[in-house]
Amino acid sequence: MWKRIGMLLLILPLLVISIPVGPVSAAATFSNPVIHADVPDSDVIRVGNVYYMTSTTMHMNPGVPIMKSYDLVNWEIVNYVYDTYANTDSHNLNNGQNEYGRGSWASSLRYNNGVYYVAFSSLSTGKTYIYKTGNIETGPWTISTLGSYYHDASLLFDNGRAFLVHGTDNISIVELNAEATAVKAGGLNQVLITNASNVAGSNFIVKAEGAHIQKINGKYYVFLIAWPTGDSRVQITYRADSLTGPYTGRVVLRDSGIAQGGIVDTATGSWYALLFRDSGAVGRIPYLVPVTWSDNWPVFGVNGKVPLTMNVPVEGYPAKKIYGSDEFNAGTGTGSVQQLLVNSGFEDASLSPWTSNNTATIAATSSEFFGGSKSLLVSSRQQTAAGVKQVITGKVTQGGVYTFSAKVKYTTGPATKTFNFSIQNGPSYTGISIMGSATLTKGQWGTIQGTYTVPANADLSQTFVFLETPYSSNPDPANDLMDFYVDDVSFNTTAATGGTSTGLAKFWQWNHNPDPANWSLTQRSGFMRLTTGKVSPSLLEARNTLTQRTFGPKSTGTVAMETAGMKDGDYAGLAAFQARYGFVSVKLSGNAKSIVMANASSGTMTEVASVPLNQNRVYFRVMCDFTNQTDKAYFAYSLDGTNWTTIGNTLQMSYTLPHFMGYRFALFNYATKSTGGFVDFDYFRVE
């Protein structure tokens, strides 16, 4: 059947499927899974007649999606909690490091006294983060960092106090201050439930975790999952009359592994749970489960089973999706991040438009670099302000807010040294401001980063940014005027408001932290331009891979791409992305282009098929079949967007724990020899 459907897709023009925005009423019934896509670890709240949900997206950014619904069935992504939350080698895919399968996990979403809170822990940093905002759909968010990792933490606000419930098997509680910004000194800190798994069995693949604590009608409920050996995952509930217990527990759902999550009520008093099920390569997909009550215990499902067809809890709202097509026409609006510096990674050895500041010598070098293959060496310094600068006159505005970052390294001199990232507004040195500083360790790359607001009365007739060491009227050559290296410098615009500022449709996420210098929706109007900023051995190490979820039971993604800007050794195209990925791409070898299908299902990327390409515009298609966990992907290309040809072999998709994520459609461009090549994506269309 799929082959016949696939052939129709290859010979018929693609019908553009977009997210409905008109007043189209949803059906009175729906079928589970409620979202046939990767949405694990969900947490749902209701505020008035609106439901909000968060989920785990780990190494994808922006991170922790905020999804919105009026009926618990039709969901759309309206915001993210952060653009990025850390700036390390693993987050940036540098020096062979990554955070696949780690990143942000199992967020907790709460609303208390007019403020929205999101808490999550990170396996990458070993810390727990709490974000809060007064407007969950636009932000801005403020962040508090807890120095400890609290596994699968769940927030609770109770009688003016704040808590986190967390852990595996032995479920613990720690008290926060009333603002939920730090652990409260001397506050409650104890185990709530010992051996919480025991109500589900004696041997386990995964012991009880995924805590969700809620106070309902004066009682405290802790919802957990466990995975007994020889069984599927089960939903557990513990109940107590007081916060510290004692708690009694039971298994409340044992059905096909559907588990993990709390419960939420409707305005009319009905109750539901959004729980997920491991479902092969498409990922961990959510089911909407009815919940009733018996003797103050929640009863999940109907006769112990999750219904496959149900009435929509609240009727009359339009259909929504968390995936969609994109013509890339929205990038000229406000709010998109723009990198204001050129040649920020110094891969162009001419260094233009960088120049020396005061008396110094600057040169590109490959002897030291943080990202890509080159950095900039500053030497022969005569003053502490001597360094490297770039003029940005006309690019900034009075009152404008900008983020900045630079990697700096020095190898001679004192054990530690402070470096400044500075700006000069106007022709006089009196307009100099130190935007940010960092104390670096000799022999190690360090980061100077922060946010800078241009003064409302700044003289913008001349503006430049530069890197320096702190001022000294009598600088010591060894301790103040040492040579230093600079790499990956950024000075970016920010959104005027909002939690995130990518300028992209909300269904898109980058694989790891994006490099804002090397993607653009404005360099060519109506196109997404991806430029290579580092040399990468494979797709898994490449930055600025743009992804969105595949979905079941079948989904097809199509791109139109223009390739005139590619360089020798570049690969660019469309992938079915996970650890065992496959793609169809253009490959440039010397001056010869070819269309290549690659398959990495064995763990190693193999080029399976190749055909010559003698034009700049090309169309690619990836077709995914998740029916009954068939988990196969097929690849095709077209030279005119109408007539399609299959290429290569079938990718047997597999859900792997190193990535711990369902397959995604991925637009990519990566360099294997030299940087600076670019491609322009005209559209991505999904059905």
Model features per residue range: what roles?
Residues M1-L9:
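Bacterial N-terminal signal peptides that target proteins for export
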Residues R4-I5, S375, T550, F665:
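Hydrophobic alpha-helical segments, especially transmembrane helices
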Residues M7, A28, L155, D326, ...:
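Short non-domain terminal segments
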Residues L10-L15:
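Hydrophobic helical h-region of N-terminal Sec-dependent signal peptides
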Residues V16-T29:
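Sec-dependent signal peptide cleavage junction
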Residues A26-Q338, Q444-T447, A458, S490, ...:
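Carbohydrate-active catalytic/glycan-binding domains of CAZyme proteins
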Residues S336-T500:
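Extracellular and organelle-lumenal recognition/adhesion modules and their flexible linkers in secreted
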